[in-house]
Amino acid sequence: MASLLPLLCLCVVAAHLAGARDATPTEEPMATALGLERRSVYTGQPSPALEDWEEASEWTSWFNVDHPGGDGDFESLAAIRFYYGPARVCPRPLALEARTTDWALPSAVGERVHLNPTRGFWCLNREQPRGRRCSNYHVRFRCPLEASWGAWGPWGPCSGSCGPGRRLRRRHCPSPAGDACPGRPLEAQKCVRPRCPGCSLDTCECPDHILLGSVVTPSGQPLLGARVSLRDQPGTVATSDAHGTFRVPGVCADSRANIRAQMDGFSAGEAQAQANGSISVVTIILDKLEKPYLVKHPESRVREAGQNVTFCCKASGTPMPKKYSWFHNGTLLDRRAHGYGAHLELRGLRPDQAGIYHCKAWNEAGAVRSGTARLTVLAPGQPACDPRPREYLIKLPEDCGQPGSGPAYLDVGLCPDTRCPSLAGSSPRCGDASSRCCSVRRLERREIHCPGYVLPVKVVAECGCQKCLPPRGLVRGRVVAADSGEPLRFARILLGQEPIGFTAYQGDFTIEVPPSTQRLVVTFVDPSGEFMDAVRVLPFDPRGAGVYHEVKAMRKKAPVILHTSQSNTIPLGELEDEAPLGELVLPSGAFRRADGKPYSGPVEARVTFVDPRDLTSAASAPSDLRFVDSDGELAPLRTYGMFSVDLRAPGSAEQLQVGPVAVRVAASQIHMPGHVEALKLWSLNPETGLWEEESGFRREGSSGPRVRREERVFLVGNVEIRERRLFNLDVPERRRCFVKVRAYANDKFTPSEQVEGVVVTLVNLEPAPGFSANPRAWGRFDSAVTGPNGACLPAFCDADRPDAYTALVTATLGGEELEPAPSLPRPLPATVGVTQPYLDRLGYRRTDHDDPAFKRNGFRINLAKPRPGDPAEANGPVYPWRSLRECQGAPVTASHFRFARVEADKYEYNVVPFREGTPASWTGDLLAWWPNPQEFRACFLKVKIQGPQEYMVRSHNAGGSHPRTRGQLYGLRDARSVRDPERPGTSAACVEFKCSGMLFDQRQVDRTLVTIMPQGSCRRVAVNGLLRDYLTRHPPPVPAEDPAAFSMLAPLDPLGHNYGVYTVTDQSPRLAKEIAIGRCFDGSSDGFSREMKADAGTAVTFQCREPPAGRPSLFQRLLESPATALGDIRREMSEAAQAQARASGPLRTRRGRVRQ
C-alpha cells in the first residue's frame, strides 16, 4: 500500500485540476481578462502589497502549481492548498490576482481568463484568439486579517417554565465572511426556575425499572472502575466493570435522570438517561485529564497615555480551562477591579501601568503560565520612533578601501525595530487593527569614491512610524531517515492535531507559523509506517526571518511475534557491549482491540527504543523534553530513554491495546545521585509536544532464574498502552542555566557582522566517572535561533562539580555547518570569547582538539554554574536560570561562545541597504534588490572555472530595460569558487544575481543587466547552449561582450539547472538563498548538497591561469587602465587560439590521410 501513496496523491491533485478544467464560466460570477477580481487593474497600474482596502486584509505570496499545456493553465485553489498546505490560503479569499511570468496582466497580453477567489484561476486554450495559447500564470489571493468579536449582548430569558434550564447570549463578528472570528457566536449559562410539581428522584421510586449504562473514552474504550452517581443525589450508586458497563435498579425510566461518572485521571462526565419501556440507557464519555496549554499568548503593545489596550490569553485542555488570572510585573491583578477573564482590558492607560504582563489558566489537572508581553505607555508628546537613525555599518568592497588598512565600513543608518501605537488604540480587539512600526521615512543618495570608480549608496536620513507588514515566522526544511538519509516522501504534516499538508518528493516542507505562537509543535507521519512519528518542537524567528531545519526520522525496529496466551518480555536497548537499560513485560491475556473487546492470537510488535547511550540518537529524539510543573511553567526533563510501542494483528492496520504493562528499569544504569528516587514514566502529548506523567517507579529485586551472584535491582512502573504510543523514562532536573552563543560571518568575529537565523543546538552529556570529555550518555537537548543579540540555550549545570554535566554545542545555517573558535594549542580568551579564569573552569574543547582529522563543527564544555560573588563569572557565558533577561540583553563585549561561517568568502553589497534577518527593515525603492517584501526571489548562476586554484567571481547588477533604472547599480555579489573533490584543477562558484521582474512599484518589468567577472587572468571558453539559445530568443541582446566576462539580460523565467540558473522563491530571503545555493552545488533543480559538483548544471565556463609574480589582478588592472587590460586579454586569447590551432593541425592531417 505504501508504494501506492505517491500515485494516490497525484490522483487527488489531478482531480482538483480536472475540476477546474471542467468548469464553465457561467457557473459562478467571475472576472475575465482582468488581473484582479472586484477591482480592475490595468496595464501600468500598481497592485502593491500594502493597499488601502475597506477590509483589513493582505495579499498571500504568489503560487504557480500548473504550467500551460494541453487544455491551458489551471491554478486551482484546491491544488494550491494540497501542494502548499491549507494554512497558506485563508478559507474564504476576498480577491484573486493573476499575472504572467513576465509580470503582465491578462488584459495586457490579450488573453481571456477566469478568476474566482473561492475556486482559483483557469485559462483555456480554446477560448484564446486564433493562433494564441495561454501564458504561464501565477496567482495570489487577498485574505482578511484575523477578525475579532464585538461585545456580548444581554442574556436571554431562561428556557422552560420550571426546574433547571439555560439562557443564551450572542455576539457579532464584523467580518464579511461571518465565521472568520475564532470562537463561538453563542454562549449558554445554566439557570433555575421554580421546582416543577410532581415526581422527582427524591420522592419517586420505580422498583421494576433498571438503568443500564456504560462508561467509555471518546474512542470507545471501556473504562473499568468509574464511580457512577445521580446528579441530584450524593454517593456512588454503581461502579463500571471490565466492560465499562453498570446497572442501577429503581431509577424511573421517565425521569430523564442526569447520570454522572467520575474516575481518577479523567474529567467528570455527565449524560441524560433515555427511556425505553421499563429500561433506561445512558452512555457517559470521559475524557482523560489534560493539563491546560496555551494556544494564544498575550502580545506586546505600544500605547499612548489615555488610550486603551486589550491583552488576550487562550488555553485549551481537558476539561477546558475557565479560570484565568492576570499578573503585572509579577503581581496578581485584582479580578473584581479589572473584571477580567481570558481577556484583560485596561482603559485610560497611565504611565505606571507600563511593564510586563502575563496570564495563568487553570483546570482540574493543573495550571499553565503564558509568555510575557510588554506594555509601553508613551507620555503625551513622547515620540514612539526617534527620527534620527541609529548606526549601522556595512562593509564596502575590498577594492574600495585604503591599501593595507583592511576593509572599509560605511554607516548607512537603521531605524530601530520597535512598534508604534495603533491609530485605533482604543479598540477592544485582541490584535491591533493595523500594524505600525518604526521604519524608514526618507532615504538620501550618496556616492562613495573608490579607487577607479564611484559606488552609489542610499542611506537612511529619517525614521518615522509607518504602516508595516505584521511579522510572520517561516520554517522550511527537509525530513530524512536518520540511518540512511533517504527523504521521507509524502509524509503527513500535523500542526498540533491539524493536518496542514505533506512533505514533497525530496522530503521538503514549508510551514508558516500561526500568529501568537511560542512553541511550534509539528508531527511528521510516515505513510508507509516504517518510521516513528517524528514529533518536533521547531524553533523559529518570531520577527519574520525564515529558519531551516533538517528533521531526522527514526526507523522502527523489525517486528517480533508475541503470543497473547503467555507473558512476553521485550528488552529496551540493544547497544553492543552494553546491557539493556530495562525491559517491557506484557502479561498474558491483556491485549484488547480498540473497542475494548479481548484479543487472542499472534501480535506483531515493534518496540523502538531511543537509547541516550548512543550519542547519535539525540538528533532523532522526539519533542524537546519539557513538561508543565506545578507552578504552570515549562520545566526540563533529563531522559534515560524513550520507547515507541506499535502493536497490531498480523496483516492488519488496526492497533491493539494492552495493559497494564510493567516497565522495568535496571537501577544499575541510573548513575546520577538522586535520580533513582526521582525517575518517573511519562507519555508524550502529540498535540502540545509536552510530556505528561504516567506513573512513578518502585524498587523490586530480580527473582527466579535472574538471581546471580549479585541480585539485580529493578525500578518498576506500570502503564496502559492505549491512544498514546510514545513513552519516556525521565527525571525532572532543577539545576539549570543558560549558555550564551553568537554566530559571525567569518572567523574575525567582528561585532557588526553577526549572523542571524542560525540554529544552535546544545546536547547535555553525562560524563563517565573520571573522564569529563568521555560522556556516558546524553541527557537532553535544546535548540535556539540566533537573533541580533545571539541566542541563549537552556542546559543542566552544577555549581559544586564543574564536570557534573557537560555539553556538546553545534550550529547550522541551512545545510551549512558553522565552525566554533579553535582550542589548539590552547583556548585563547580573545578568540573563544570567554575571559579567564572562567574559561579554564569551563574546559572549552573544539571537537578536533584531540584529533585534527575530526570535523570542526562543535565544541564541548563543562557546564559550571557561575559562582555568586565572583566578578570573573558574572558576565557570561553561563548564566543562572533566573537570569534569562541578563543573558538575552548582554552586550557583545560580555563573554559568549562563538561560531563562524565556513563559507565566508562571500560579499554582498546593496545600493539600498537591507537586513535579511529583519524583513521589517525593507524599504520601498526602485533600486531595492528585493522588490517585494512578501515574496523574495533568489537567483544564482553556476560558474565553472578551469584553473589551479580557487577564484573570486563578481556579479555586477544594474538596470537593464526599465527607463528609470537603466544603467544604475542595484548591487554587487562576490563568491569564491569551491573545488570539486573529484576533479583536480576544476572549481565552481554559485554567484547570486538580481532576478528580473517587477520593481517595487509593480508598474513595469526590468531585465537586470548582469555581468559576471572572475578575478584573475581568465577568459570565457563556453556558455551553456540552452541558456545561449534562450537569451537569443528573448531580446534585446546585450552589447558587445568582454571576452573576460559574461553578460546577459537576466531571464524572466525560472529556467532551472539545465540552463545553469537556479531560482527559488520564498517568504524569507535567507531561506530562498540557502535553498538555491544547495541546489546550485548539487547541480539539480530539486536536490541539495554542500559538496560542489563542478560539472553539473553550469551556465558559463572560464579558463584561468596564474599571473606572473608581481603582476596585479584583473580587477586592479581594469581599475587602473581598462584599455591596456582589455588589450592584454585579447592578445592572450589570440595566442591561446593560435596554439590550439597548431596543436590540432597535425591531428586533422593524419585523419585525412587515414580516410584516403
Swiss-Prot record:
Q: Which UniProt keywords apply?
A: Cleavage on pair of basic residues, Disulfide bond, Extracellular matrix, Glycoprotein, Immunoglobulin domain, Secreted, Signal
> Major location, coarse class?
secreted
Instruction: Tell whether Metal-binding is among the UniProt keywords.
Output: no
Q: Which residues are glycosylated?
A: 276, 308, 329
**Leader peptide range in chain numbering:** 1-20
Q: Provide the Ig-like C2-type domain boundaries.
A: 292-376
Coiled coil, from the record = none
Q: What does this protein do?
A: May play a role in cartilage scaffolding.
Name the PANTHER family for this protein. Answer: CARTILAGE INTERMEDIATE LAYER PROTEIN 2, CARTILAGE INTERMEDIATE LAYER PROTEIN CLIP
- The protein depicted here goes by the name Cartilage intermediate layer protein 2
Give the species.
Answer: Homo sapiens
Lineage, opening ranks:
Eukaryota, Metazoa, Chordata, Craniata, Vertebrata
